[in-house]
């Protein structure tokens, strides 16, 4: 009699994905982030579900309902802050996961990579709509500013914005639909994650050397299951430390003031994980130009497989490309810092320089350096 794990139609899928999956023997801790993102997604859906049980998507009661969750619901404060800080963890891991993909050339798996970029867009949309739900000052003004960007689309822009708002300004209709979308999107994301994994398991995982690892594979369980559990342990320690000691560290104090359409906050800015894109948006004085730069700053990820010009897949043995990679990381950190600063003299120029450098590094410096490395290696 065959093992049920290998014969049962449903369990067989799980077995081929997480148990008997042949994995390269040399994948490092950088390969932990995929599973961590899965855990984060599960955690967000679970905490979000419990929050939705007590939240009311109405402009008059939304803010009070969040206060009620924190004060009156059993461990409501814990659920709320796990959800808010869980989103931050989610994005930290997302950026690490993408960075790993760029460094080790994982973008060569075109299908997996492109679904991944679409996943990034979906997660960003979900996070943006979630930030609107507490209906604080930054929620309201963030929603107003970001949705207004669509008015830059020629001809249909203004109509499109009013259609999204469900009226002539951000109001009750907007909040209700944002809640509906924020609830449904994580399930769509889960389906996309399954497709992401389906494509990945067609090719098998990449590894730090970037070379074919068919000759040296080990079963996913127990080797990488135990490694992933260790990663989850570190993640939970970090998340719970944030939640228990400094739950508002990554939030904005303005969001503790109920939304007031008659009073604009002095500095409208998104959550920290969007600041780099916000800095790129602000660095262009033209509205449509800024919106295009914002979209392209993420969409540019789809060009990586096309721009790859090295004979080697990974950057492990390419010191010049490594320098550029870390330059890009530093550049993104500078953009993140600038995104949180007011639009004043030194910051405007720094933001514009960092934005130009971001696109220049990816589109010109990285491919040309890879070609130079080929020449140096006489390839």
Curated annotation (Swiss-Prot):
Membrane topology: Multi-pass membrane protein
Ligand binding (a ubiquinone): 201
Leader sequence segment: none
Main location: mitochondrion
InterPro entries per the UniProt record, alphabetical: Cyt_b/b6_C, Cyt_b/b6_C_sf, Cyt_b/b6_N, Cytb/b6-like_sf, Cytochrome_b, Cytochrome_b_C_euk/bac, Cytochrome_b_N_euk/bac, Di-haem_cyt_TM
One Gene Ontology term from the biological process aspect of the record: mitochondrial electron transport, ubiquinol to cytochrome c
Domain of life: Eukaryota
Membrane-spanning intervals of the chain: 33-53, 77-98, 113-133, 178-198, 226-246, 288-308, 320-340, 347-367
Keywords: Electron transport, Heme, Iron, Membrane, Metal-binding, Mitochondrion, Mitochondrion inner membrane, Respiratory chain, Transmembrane, Transmembrane helix, Transport, Ubiquinone
Pfam families: Cytochrom_B_C, Cytochrome_B
Subcellular location: Mitochondrion inner membrane
GO cellular component entries: mitochondrial inner membrane; respiratory chain complex III
Family label: Belongs to the cytochrome b family.
Further comment: Heme 1 (or BL or b562) is low-potential and absorbs at about 562 nm, and heme 2 (or BH or b566) is high-potential and absorbs at about 566 nm.
Function, as annotated: Component of the ubiquinol-cytochrome c reductase complex (complex III or cytochrome b-c1 complex) that is part of the mitochondrial respiratory chain. The b-c1 complex mediates electron transfer from ubiquinol to cytochrome c. Contributes to the generation of a proton gradient across the mitochondrial membrane that is then used for ATP synthesis.
PANTHER family assigned: CYTOCHROME B
Protein name: Cytochrome b
Gene designation: MT-CYB
């Amino acid at each position: 009699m065959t093992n049920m794990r290998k014969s049962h139609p449903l369990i067989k899928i799980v077995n081929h994905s997480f148990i008997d999956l042949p994995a390269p023997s040399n994948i490092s801790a950088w390969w932990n982030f995929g599973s961590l993102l899965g855990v984060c997604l599960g955690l967000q859906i679970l905490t979000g579900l419990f929050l939705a049980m007590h939240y009311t998507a109405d402009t008059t009661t939304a803010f009070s309902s969040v206060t009620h969750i924190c004060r009156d619901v059993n461990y409501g404060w814990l659920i709320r802050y796990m959800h808010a800080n869980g989103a931050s963890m989610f994005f930290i891991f997302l950026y690490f996961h993408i960075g790993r993909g760029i460094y080790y050339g994982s973008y060569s798996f075109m299908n997996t990579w492109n679904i991944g970029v679409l996943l990034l867009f979906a997660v960003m949309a979900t996070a943006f709509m979630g930030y609107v739900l507490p209906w604080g000052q930054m929620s309201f003004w963030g929603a107003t500013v970001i949705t207004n960007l669509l008015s830059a689309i020629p001809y249909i822009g203004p109509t499109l914005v009013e259609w999204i708002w469900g009226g002539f300004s951000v109001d009750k209709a907007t909040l209700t639909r944002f809640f509906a979308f924020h609830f449904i999107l994580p399930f769509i994301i889960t389906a996309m994650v399954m497709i992401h994994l389906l494509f990945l398991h067609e090719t098998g995982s990449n590894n730090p050397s970037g070379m074919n690892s068919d000759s040296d594979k080990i079963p996913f369980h127990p080797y990488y299951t135990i490694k992933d559990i260790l990663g989850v342990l570190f993640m939970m320690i970090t998340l719970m430390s944030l939640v228990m000691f400094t739950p508002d560290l990554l939030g904005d104090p303005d969001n503790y003031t109920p939304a007031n359409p008659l009073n604009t906050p002095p500095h409208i800015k998104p959550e920290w994980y969007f600041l780099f894109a916000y800095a790129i948006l602000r660095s262009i004085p033209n509205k449509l130009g800024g919106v295009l730069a914002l979209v392209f700053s993420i969409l540019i990820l789809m060009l990586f497989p096309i721009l790859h010009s090295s004979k080697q897949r990974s950057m492990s043995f390419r010191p010049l490309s490594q320098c550029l990679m870390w330059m890009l990381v530093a550049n993104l950190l500078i953009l993140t810092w600038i995104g949180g600063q007011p639009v004043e003299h030194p910051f405007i120029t720094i933001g514009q320089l960092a934005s130009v450098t971001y696109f220049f590094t990816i589109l010109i410096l990285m491919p040309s350096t890879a070609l130079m490395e080929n020449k140096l290696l006489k390839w």
